[in-house]
Amino acid sequence: CGTLMGGLSKILTECEHDVSGSDLNFYEPMSSQLEALKIDLVKGYERLPDADLYVIGNALSRGNPCVEKILEENLDYISGPEMLGKIIKSKKVIAVSGTHGKTTVSAMTASILQSKYGDVGYLIGGVLGDGSWSARLGSNEYFIVEADEYDSAFFDKRSKFIHYFPNILAINNIEFCLLYTSPSPRDTIRS
């Protein structure tokens, strides 16, 4: 389970949703975090858990048994970034983007705002140095999100950060290096 889907699972449990998930494998640090939340983790894609809405991560594509069942049965689904965007739409969103350092800058921003304003929300793509969760909804108006340029899902090729509508955008740095997301320097700048 990736850091976006794992963090989103944590936030959804805070919103009092029942959450379960399927993946081929569950790795640290996400596996421990999800197990602590008592989320039903299904190893493999043979069994699609019952749900009102399926949140599909960008690691899944057509041909995946769960994806195919969702499409064949016309079940409701959404991408992880779009789901997060809906949850945080009423917050003051601070998005941290750039080629390198997003996790570090996001964590530092969350820590600074936490000390100033209290219970801020965040979703960060890494483990925090103090051992706290990689995500939480927070009770105040601020939400910090690590906003990367990877596509949202097989059915939504837009960058994840398109869904976050930040009030503040921190662009850490831009480097032409990810040819699979931006085939030219112009595409890198445009995204």
Give each language-model segment a name.
Residues C1-M83:
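N-terminal leader/targeting and accessory segments in enzymes
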Residues I11-E14, P49, N58, R62-P183, ...:
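Phosphate-binding loop of NTP-binding sites
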